[in-house]
Amino acid sequence: MYIINLILPLIGSIITGLFGHKLGNKLSIQIAVGCMMLTALSSLYIGYEILLCNSVVHFKLSTWMQVGSLNVEYGLLYDSLTSIMIIVITCISSMVHLYSMDYMKADPHKTRFFSYLSLFTFFMMLLVTADNFVQLFFGWEGVGIMSYLLINFWYTRLQANKSALKAVILNRFGDFGLFFGILLVFLVFKSVDFSVIFTVAPFITEYTINLLGYEVNAITLIGSFIVIGVVGKSAQLGLHMWLPDAMEGPTPVSALLHAATMVTAGVFLVLRTSPLLSYSITILNILTIIGALTTLFATTIGIVQNDIKRVIAYSTCSQLGYMIFACGLLNYNASIYHLTTHAFFKALLFLSAGSVIHGLNDEQDMRKMGGLVNLMPLTYQCMLIGTLALTGFPFLSGYYSKDIILETSYATYYWEGTFAAIIGYVAAFGTTFYSFRLLILTFFNKPRMQYKTIAGVHEASTNMVIPLVILAICSIFIGYLTKDLFVGLGTPIWNNSFFAYPYNNLILESEVLQRELKLLPLFAFIYGVLTPVLFYFNLKEDRMVHLIKNPIAKESYFFFVKKWYFDFLSRVLIAVPFFHLSYDVMNKDLDKGLWEQIGVTGVATALVNEFTEFKLNNEITLSTYISYIVQAILLIIFVGIFSFMIGFLYVELFVILGALYLCLPKIK
């Protein structure tokens, strides 16, 4: 069951990708969707065994590689964290597959699309079931390359090409950090296996590594590189620029990327390595600050966006910030709780937005929408449920998961927790503001489309509606039904999946907070609803235009529109200098300049010139040509032998020095 659960998406991807043209589009797509549905059902069964029966399954399949002391085995680890993740991944992915059957119906390359979707899911499953860092990194890289292929699915679009490259390049910074973190893990622990590392971690909390002459705590240094990987993959502040550009892919890709797969990989990495990272207060503080600032940043940017998908994308970035700073405050169970509920209502929002875009002939600008509440009533109801869940409306999913993060953050009574809680409350207001702004501009007021567009507006088809209804039901009930399972005081399901200090019982503290603090999210919700209603409902004049006549409001507006100038600074300080260095210096001045002159082109030109001058001054015979050819061949042979001997001597020298180095301890 466990192996089948992992390989079913791979089987669906191979059949659809390699044999789709022979089997036909319809049959191959049905196979891919069927494999994903079976995977989701098997994940639910595994969740029953692991979560409700309170068991852990860990087994080794084979030895992957063995080089010296490095022994990497291919194994699968199904614990509470893994079972929650595979349920979320496969359920959301199966809904996206079903939705895409009609959404991509007219696309000529739909078999390739479904193959990519299934392979994307397989790599994410491989990542979360890994029992060692190397296997996790393999899944990590697979998710990255598949995101490139999916964002760039419509490869004839220039903007899609640029967005996919941007996503890959920025994620390479994160991959670089994780790669070096894994190298340091092996250097310190002599193993990459989670069970070994987490068992030894408490005994090396004082171990240091000499870095450029400074003694640095080993766990802090390892954690720093892991955090770089988390920041890149989960689009946290600094490496977030790829996230809104990823909207260039098809809308189902956005739902899969930003709900259950790629962006949650960073949060999963923090949760998986929590038995290691929790021993470094520095790393926990960094996670808290980065997560809180990302929440604030994404909220302010989302307020001024006009693209319906980009608004939802920035809300994803903001919610990921909640999860990250919850991890930094050791609220791991609250973080995975919010990750789970967020996956369902965020997938609902993206797929509802896809239904709107599909009905409006691919229009994404909210300023060109309006009046759709009567034309697309079911889509409106689903979008409303997703919006209410996102904003924390009482008794919906987001209400339980987001409020527990805010309450436990304030209950830490440290400055980091207070800082994160204050930003979280402010972001809760901003989230409500831009969510209802989206709802009002899209579904209310007078239609702002062309008449021919209005005439063609239609509700989504059955295959697109079924996932919306299922996700809407989950967005309403899953937070309430799973609250005790995730954050209940008596829940035993987490066992050793997470690490927390024994005195870190923040759930109890959050239950006795002041009433005013518990009501703050509700006040933020009320004001967040009233403000966009005041500015955008039944517009007779653009009230925002009058607002930004105020100099401070105007500067703030442009600061947010320019995305805090991150794109500008990254282009001016990083991209342009590197392009100048690579093209003007390395390419023109060196590759096509200096190296050509002292290399093949320069030598050939000099020889031709010399020989031409020699011919003009001397009589050349056939024997002279033969003599020169023989001399050239002998010269080439001599140079080759000489180079080989020099290289051989260097190798011998290194061998001798290495032998002496190994013998030195014995001599002493």
UniProtKB/Swiss-Prot annotation:
EC numbers, comma separated: 7.1.1.2
Subcellular location(s) per record: Mitochondrion inner membrane
Membrane topology type: Multi-pass membrane protein
One GO process term, biological-process aspect: ATP synthesis coupled electron transport
Chief localisation class: mitochondrion
Highest taxon listed in the record's lineage: Eukaryota
Disulfide bonds: none
Enzyme class of the recorded protein, top EC level: translocase
Family to which the UniProt record says this protein belongs: Belongs to the complex I subunit 5 family.
Protein purpose: Core subunit of the mitochondrial membrane respiratory chain NADH dehydrogenase (Complex I) that is believed to belong to the minimal assembly required for catalysis. Complex I functions in the transfer of electrons from NADH to the respiratory chain. The immediate electron acceptor for the enzyme is believed to be ubiquinone.
Name of the protein: NADH-ubiquinone oxidoreductase chain 5
